[in-house]
Amino acid sequence: MTTCLGLAANAGGGEIHFREVSSAWGLDFRHNAGISGRMYMVETMAGGVVLFDYDGDGDDDVLFIDGGVLPGYEGQPPRSRLFRNDAGGDTPRFVDVTDAAGLDFDGYGMGGAAGDVDGDGDLDLYVTAFGKNELLLNLGTGRFRAGGVEREVDDPRWSASAAFGDIDLDGDLDLYVVNYTDFSTTNHKFCGPAGSDGAKADTAGARGYCHPDMYNGVADRLYRNDGRGFFVDATVESGLGDAAEAGLGVVIGDLDGDAWPDLYVANDKDPNLLFRGVGDGRFEDESLLSGAAYDRSGIAEAGMGVELADLDGDGRQDLVVTNFALETNAFYASAGSGVFLDRRYPAGLAQPSLQHLAFGVNALDADLDGDLDLFVANGHIQPNAAHIGEVGTYEQPNQLFENLGNGRFRVRQDVGLDIVRTSRGSAVADLNLDGDLDMVVVNSNQPSEVYENRTVGQWLAVGLSLSGQSEVGARIELTAGDRVQARETRAGSSYLSQSTLTAFFGLGAGEFVDRLVVRPPGPGRPLLLRDLPASRRLLLRR
């Protein structure tokens, strides 16, 4: 069954233009890292944002994930906040419903992901933390209740990103949680320039936040859903092992084209991990063989965020990993069968990212021309970077890389992304229902940003409602003229964040879609639609 939810007035080609609208839309949020002056490592690594339709009314709502109270902090306690989207007219209105929704998570929040874990038709939340993680179960009444302890996913270690996916294709959502290091406020160390030590006065400006190699990495966790929304730790039995790396980003998707979900983890100063799904929830470690574990010189980089999308238009899913300053961001182009080629230099992504420390990353068709562009959120971890001998400034401009076709990019400096802060998590969704993707950026201990996409062009938006299974992991293929585009629905990506579950396609000036194929996760039959008008929002039910 196909439902047409509406259309917007966009037509013709598009020149990229964004406008910052956080106050105008009622999305004022300032991240609070709980800074005490003691330079606790966790202070500089948060926070994330989740864009998801928690109330099932057809538009995406916004969850900002805040920090928490650390020893020595004396301000107001930080608090994660949920904003309900009351879209309508040219200017949407967001309402803070944190209290009404029963979101009383009071841990030190890092990131999150949203998915229907118990199969009741609404989206639940998983929030990662420095401390116990929490699963917030959506009651379907506009309220949530805590279920992390009950469902056995309340990992007490320092977790970063998380992602939902049906890793065994049994119809329910499993959960992968990325853990970072064993840092705590009790094993806190003095870190500064080479040769400095704790005898140096902090007031001399010599102290910085510690890098991850000062601590031990912590093993990630894979939780298998039992079909009722309860979870079992399946990390070891699935073949993932118990290796302890300093992980930050994760995506779940089909990396080798065999229809089984695979896992990719961005690690900080450790080799990135690629686990190939071989069936029934089992994995094989293909990290080294894949070509996506190191840079082209065989060096492990400081991976932060990760995106998985078809960036060169060949139908295969490519990887982008954001890295530390002087490393450049990585573009691993899929060569098929789970093999990747490092094409960051020929793609034009390396040199412009050399001086930046990048975190969030999102693939979106910003100009609606039919190929995917890239947004990258930048910001250093050291407020005194120059003083302690590190490259770059603390506040850094974010970047939009326009896709010139076939996976080659150029930086656009004139698109309205003018605010310079210290960015971390980022996500995209059509928040005002006008057919293009808007952006939300969380800045460390600073106000967040919301950018309305003002680009004009034709488009198609596809939402899914699949009876008996989640839409997460579905593949949607669109043919318009001689161009074929592919999207996968994903619950968790970028850095500590999640973007919309609705698939968006830019059509340029095209007025019709010749063919749309939806391939649900697992063995279900594909859904085929033909001759669709452009600039429509479709909700496909089965």
Label each residue range with its predicted role.
Residues 11-17, 25, 35-36, 348-351, ...:
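Gly/Ser/Thr/Pro-enriched helix-cap/hinge segments flanking short amphipathic alpha-helices
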Residues 18-21, 92-102, 143-152, 229-241, ...:
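Blade-edge beta-strand/turn elements of extracellular beta-propeller
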Residues 27-48, 76, 101-113, 150-163, ...:
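Repeat-based blade/solenoid architectures
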Residues 38, 46-56, 84, 108-119, ...:
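Beta-propeller blade termini
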Residues 60-66, 120-129, 175-179, 258, ...:
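Hydrophobic beta-strand segments that make up the repeating blades of beta-propeller
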Residues 65-78, 181-215, 377-394:
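Short, conserved, GDST-rich strand-edge loop motifs in beta-rich repeat architectures
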Residues 80-85, 219-225, 276, 333, ...:
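Beta-propeller blade signature
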Residues 97-114, 127-167, 177-213, 218-219, ...:
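Asp-box/WD-like beta-propeller blade repeats and closely related beta-sheet repeat scaffolds
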